[in-house]
């Protein structure tokens, strides 16, 4: 699955797959997010089964089938469901004769995360990684302040699987849920990926430039519920 990152200019610079520490960092990232209950990791696999299997092909579930290598990864995405902590003012105190417990206080605002170079592998450009992730995080927090949102944390489709509907399918997974919930959808898009989001209702609310790496911070309003 890590080979899917090879076409990303940002990952080539900051997490080169030739660097063992960078590869391990990406593996840890995937493992961490697979265990995150708020994360939805969607993996698209290339169908390598023949259209008409040979009569002698072993049935599914046999030892031969279990030992077969997994299908190649055609792309993957991580969607995060981000409900906004309640910031509504507390109701007025109840009359003294009311013995019911007081309502809980409103949730505290989410503390700002700070990204530093020591958080990233030295085999890549750790300073650039910290700058990009900080800009992306700050833009996310600003664009979705006070709003529930589905956040597309990552969508990666290798070049050989592009223009086959893989990216659109991975994108629709979260957009359908955002529309069902009546929530906004948010993504930090590269210049290469931006046309896909343009076609699916996203609008750029801000952009950050890091030399030849440009991040487009994009928001999509929910469509009518079905």
Model feature map: region roles:
Residues 55-162:
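Conserved acyl-donor/pantetheine-binding loop and adjacent beta-alpha core of acyl/acetyltransferases
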Residues 1:
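Non-catalytic, usually N-terminal nucleic-acid engagement modules in DNA/RNA processing proteins
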Residues 148-150, 177-190:
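Conserved GNAT acetyl-CoA-binding A-motif
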């Amino acid at each position: 699955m890590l080979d899917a990152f090879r076409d990303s200019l940002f990952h080539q610079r900051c997490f080169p797959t030739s660097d063992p520490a960078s590869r391990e960092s990406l593996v840890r990232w995937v493992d961490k997010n697979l265990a995150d209950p708020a994360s939805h990791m969607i993996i698209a696999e290339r169908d390598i089964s023949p259209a008409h299997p040979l009569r002698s092909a072993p049935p599914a579930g046999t030892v031969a089938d279990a030992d077969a290598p997994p299908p190649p990864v055609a792309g993957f995405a991580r969607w995060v469901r981000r409900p906004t902590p309640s910031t509504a003012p507390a109701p007025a105190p109840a009359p003294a004769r009311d013995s019911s417990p007081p309502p809980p206080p409103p949730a505290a605002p989410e503390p700002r995360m700070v990204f530093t170079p020591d958080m990233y592998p030295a085999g890549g450009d750790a300073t650039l990684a910290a700058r990009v992730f900080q800009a992306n995080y700050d833009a996310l927090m600003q664009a979705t302040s006070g709003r529930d949102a589905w956040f597309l944390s990552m969508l990666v489709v290798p070049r050989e699987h592009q223009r086959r509907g893989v990216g659109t399918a991975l994108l629709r997974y979260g957009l359908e849920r955002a529309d069902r919930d009546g929530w906004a959808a948010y993504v930090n898009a590269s210049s290469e990926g931006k046309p896909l989001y343009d076609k699916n209702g996203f609008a750029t609310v801000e952009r950050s430039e890091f030399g030849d790496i440009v991040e487009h911070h994009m928001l999509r309003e929910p469509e009518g519920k079905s």
